[in-house]
């Protein structure tokens, strides 16, 4: 994409209660509030997720990719699709070779544990009536998040029901469909075309994403931009 992004600190007024980072079309916000309380070994995974090839790249392609797709699809955001892609890119970093040290690998694994724990915590809070303290204890015991991070995260889950579920559910779908595509297409599978097919949809519900990937496999896994005009 032609668009570029910059990395900025989270504004001081909201930083104490904000998440660790948030990617977008023009910028990636990284939370620098109380840095001693934040483990830096997660920065590689966080950058992949929020910036490139995660949210900033996805948002740029949503506005620039060719195709006869309604404009609202470029500006809408389905969390399962967007956060699923973001979490998938953390895993994709292994293939890309960007995790240089054992600490960075540990950071990615820590993030994976965190997203899996959300499935339990969100359900506990909003279906089984868990207390804030019980949710904090579960996250504390099952992840490597700092005390400051887990406190702000639990408050986020309380105030935004089900959003935290979308990360792992979306990533599980993308990785499952990739595995199916690799098995079905064999040597014809090209992960570049697989990724282009996902990102070219802009933002869609997970059911639509699954249908689109099934259709792509049935068509033989082609380059979705093979006939696109060069601009």
Regions found by a protein language model. Give the residues of each.
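Long, His/Glu/Asp-enriched segments that create or flank divalent metal/ion-associated functional microenvironments
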Residues: 1-231
């Amino acid at each position: 994409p032609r668009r570029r992004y910059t990395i900025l600190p989270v504004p001081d007024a909201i930083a104490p209660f904000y998440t660790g980072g948030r990617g977008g079309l023009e910028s990636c916000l990284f939370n620098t509030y109380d840095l001693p309380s934040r483990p830096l070994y997660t920065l590689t995974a966080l950058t992949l997720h929020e910036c490139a090839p995660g949210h900033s790249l996805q948002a740029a392609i949503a506005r620039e990719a060719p195709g006869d797709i309604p404009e609202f699809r470029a500006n809408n955001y389905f969390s399962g699709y967007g956060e699923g892609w973001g979490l998938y890119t953390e895993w994709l970093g292994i293939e890309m070779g960007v995790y240089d040290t054992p600490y960075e690998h540990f950071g990615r694994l820590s993030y994976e544990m965190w997203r899996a724990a959300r499935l339990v915590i969100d359900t506990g809070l909003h279906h089984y009536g868990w207390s804030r303290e019980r949710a904090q204890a579960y996250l504390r015991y099952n992840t490597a998040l700092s005390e400051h991070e887990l406190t702000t995260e639990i408050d986020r889950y309380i105030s935004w029901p089900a959003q935290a579920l979308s990360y792992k559910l979306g990533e599980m779908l993308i990785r499952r469909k990739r595995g199916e595509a690799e098995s079905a297409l064999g040597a014809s599978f090209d992960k570049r075309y697989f990724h282009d097919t996902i990102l070219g949809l802009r933002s869609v519900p997970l059911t639509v994403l699954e249908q689109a990937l099934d259709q792509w496999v049935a068509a033989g896994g082609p380059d979705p931009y093979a006939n696109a005009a060069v601009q």
